[in-house]
């Protein structure tokens, strides 16, 4: 058996490619190309040894688990086709060997194997690789030695963790081969990433109508929530699959502004917006589209010098100035609130787990200038770490407790005395036209209790629909023994349970939630929500999911079309009618006398 000959002629590779493909590059051998030749020769030797022992006709190995992961070896089976079922049903695989077969085509479903770290396609008859190969961002080794590849897809640029791309033995264009020879795999992948045109722009997201608005006089309100990915967090090391030009803040902020202008929501809640971007860019730019805003940075900014503090991200609420007047605004500092609660004094979990987090919530109290309806608008960014479900729950409990206290206070707020819009020089739109303020101001509405005031609560809650955070907000209560709290001690929260007085619902629950709101290679799921009070508002329209066909070749965001790793949520509501009497006497101030003259 040791003297057995390989089952293909020595002068030709198994796929019929002459050995001259290996030796015909008339250049000095470099370190990188020497590695290509060595690894290619190793691959051929392994196949030859298996041929000599008759292993090429053995049954294909089923999925096996080793200390390094799960793998399937279909090498040397003379396979001409691989069914897509393998890729779809075995998405858990970390290694896949399809080398030394007779494959001429690789199905696009290969993109389903997003856990792969090692893929060997050597010694086949492949003439091309599908663009979906770029979805395999966990790949460390991609071996395509000794095929018939005449080019490589630009989507390989997404494979930022790739350590070895084995291309020797293919009629690859000289410019690509030159980069590999002189600079190696890492630089070739970078070349693809930085020069790729990227995917075609996706279709516009569908607008989903849940209920028709039949009365043109019906009061409506639209809200948009968006984690815009702070510039400080948007690094090449974190988002290595994205071209550097698409990560640049100057590029991303223009895309973000473009979406905000396109949606034209009455209320906009942004998370991960830093102080500098709020003051120097968004506040000024959005003022041209009738927006005013409030902002607070995360609590660590208080201890920093001004130059560092302006780079700290936080939460901002923008609102249409011609439609709403700001009655009050409040900051909810979770850590500071927690350590100052009498029932939590001495609780070690507060000091060890909650206090070190600087996450915040921002709450605004608005009034519709024309109808007198009032709104509580909350915007929050909850702690991110999946291992701290208890901290997330405590933060949201403090948020809801704070909103409840503010709501009680605001239910007793006096009527707004002057709701005529004041116009500023930067309040005109880009064409120099003034905002439309034709509606006459109406009397302020009264609310008997805080829970009667319409609530819109936006944010990145970093919590899935199966979480305790979701349960608390939608059900209004959770038990002190909830699994997300574990065995931690958080004062009354873990003694008596947690509750709030509002009747809240996720806007997107009407369609079973979004497919995802956060889209990165290692996670695609729902973390962001717009909640609304069902006793005062009815959701009638939603901005739908991103096109699935587009996503088939996009391993993660951000990219040239989506400037954040989160997507914007956008919803429309009608304000339900109320029987409460309106305040009969309203003082609109000096402006009323001016109108009479």
UniProtKB/Swiss-Prot annotation:
GO terms for cellular component: CCR4-NOT core complex; nucleus; P-body. Residues 12-28, 51-69 have a biased composition (Polar residues). Mg(2+) binds at residue 272. PANTHER family: CARBON CATABOLITE REPRESSOR PROTEIN 4 (PTHR12121), POLY(A)-SPECIFIC RIBONUCLEASE (PTHR12121:SF100). Residues 1-69 are annotated as: Disordered. It is an enzyme of class 3 (hydrolase). Keywords: Cytoplasm, Exonuclease, Hydrolase, Leucine-rich repeat, Magnesium, Metal-binding, Nuclease, Nucleus, Repeat, RNA-binding, Transcription, Transcription regulation. InterPro entries: CCR4/nocturin_mRNA_transcr, Endo/exonu/phosph_ase_sf, Endo/exonuclease/phosphatase, Leu-rich_rpt, Leu-rich_rpt_typical-subtyp, LRR_dom_sf. The keyword Transcription regulation applies. Pfam families: Exo_endo_phos. One of its GO terms (biological process) is nuclear-transcribed mRNA poly(A) tail shortening. Its main location: cytoplasm. CDD domains: Deadenylase_CCR4. Its EC number is 3.1.13.4. It comes from Phaeosphaeria nodorum (strain SN15 / ATCC MYA-4574 / FGSC 10173). Its cofactor is Mg(2+). It is found in: Cytoplasm; Nucleus. LRR repeats lie at residues 66-89, 92-113, 115-136, 138-159, 161-183. Acts as a catalytic component of the CCR4-NOT core complex, which in the nucleus seems to be a general transcription factor, and in the cytoplasm the major mRNA deadenylase involved in mRNA turnover. Ccr4 has 3'-5' RNase activity with a strong preference for polyadenylated substrates and also low exonuclease activity towards single-stranded DNA. Belongs to the CCR4/nocturin family. One of its GO terms (molecular function) is 3'-5'-RNA exonuclease activity. This is CCR4-Not complex 3'-5'-exoribonuclease subunit Ccr4.
């Amino acid at each position: 058996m040791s003297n057995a000959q390989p089952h293909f002629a020595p002068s030709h590779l198994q796929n019929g490619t002459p050995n001259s493909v290996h030796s015909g590059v008339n250049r000095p051998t470099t370190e990188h190309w020497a590695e290509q030749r060595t690894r290619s020769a190793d691959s051929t030797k392994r196949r030859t040894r298996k041929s000599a022992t008759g292993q090429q006709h053995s049954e294909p190995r089923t999925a096996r688990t080793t200390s390094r992961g799960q793998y399937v070896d279909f090498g040397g089976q003379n396979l001409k086709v691989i069914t897509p079922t393998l890729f779809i049903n075995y998405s858990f695989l970390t290694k896949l060997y399809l080398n030394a077969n007779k494959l001429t085509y690789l199905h696009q479903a290969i993109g389903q194997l997003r856990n792969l770290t090692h893929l060997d396609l050597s010694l086949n008859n492949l003439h091309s690789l599908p663009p979906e190969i770029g979805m395999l961002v966990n790949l460390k080794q991609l071996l395509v030695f000794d095929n018939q590849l005449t080019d490589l897809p630009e989507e390989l640029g997404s494979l930022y963790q790739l350590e070895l791309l084995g291309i020797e033995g293919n009629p690859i264009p000289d410019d690509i081969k030159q980069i590999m020879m002189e600079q190696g795999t890492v630089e070739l992948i970078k070349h693809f990433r930085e020069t790729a045109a990227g995917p075609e722009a996706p279709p516009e997201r569908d607008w989903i109508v849940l209920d028709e608005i039949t009365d043109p006089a019906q009061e409506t309100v639209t809200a948009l929530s968006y984690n815009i990915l702070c510039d400080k967090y948007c690094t090449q090391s974190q988002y290595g699959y994205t071209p550097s030009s698409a990560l640049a803040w100057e590029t991303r902020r223009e895309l973000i502004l473009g979406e905000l202008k396109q949606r034209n929501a009455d209320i906009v809640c942004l998370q991960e917006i830093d102080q500098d971007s709020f003051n120097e860019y968004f506040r000024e730019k959005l003022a041209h589209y009738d927006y005013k805003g409030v902002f607070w940075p995360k609590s660590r900014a208080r201890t920093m010098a001004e130059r560092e503090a302006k780079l700290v991200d936080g939460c901002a609420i923008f609102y249409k100035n011609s439609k709403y007047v700001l009655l009050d605004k409040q900051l909810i500092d979770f850590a500071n609130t927690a350590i100052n609660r009498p029932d939590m004094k001495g609780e070690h979990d507060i000091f060890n787990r909650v206090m070190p987090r600087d996450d915040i919530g921002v709450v605004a109290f608005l009034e519709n200038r024309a109808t007198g309806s009032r709104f509580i608008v909350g915007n929050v960014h909850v702690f991110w770490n999946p291992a701290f479900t208890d901290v997330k729950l405590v933060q949201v409990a403090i948020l809801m407790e704070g909103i409840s206290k503010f709501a009680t206070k605001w239910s007793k707020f006096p009527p707004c005395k002057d709701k005529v819009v004041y116009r500023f020089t930067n309040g005109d739109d880009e064409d120099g036209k003034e905002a439309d303020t034709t509606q006459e101001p109406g009397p302020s509405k009264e609310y008997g209790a805080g829970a009667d005031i319409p609530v819109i609560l936006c944010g990145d809650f970093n919590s899935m629909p199966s979480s305790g955070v979701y349960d608390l907000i939608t059900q209004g209560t959770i038990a002190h023994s909830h699994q997300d709290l574990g065995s931690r001690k958080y004062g009354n929260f873990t003694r008596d349970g947690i509750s709030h007085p509002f009747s809240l619902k996720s806007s997107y629950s009407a369609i079973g939630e979004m497919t995802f709101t956060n889209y990165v290679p290692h996670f695609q799921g729902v973390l962001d929500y717009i909640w609304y009070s069902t006793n005062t508002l009815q959701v009638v329209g939603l901005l739908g999911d991103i096109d699935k066909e587009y996503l088939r070749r996009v391993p993660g965001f951000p990219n040239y079309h989506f400037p954040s790793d989160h997507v914007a949520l956008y919803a429309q509501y009608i304000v339900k009618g109320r029987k409460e009497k309106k305040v009969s006497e309203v003082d609109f101030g000096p402006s009323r006398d001016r109108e009479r003259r």
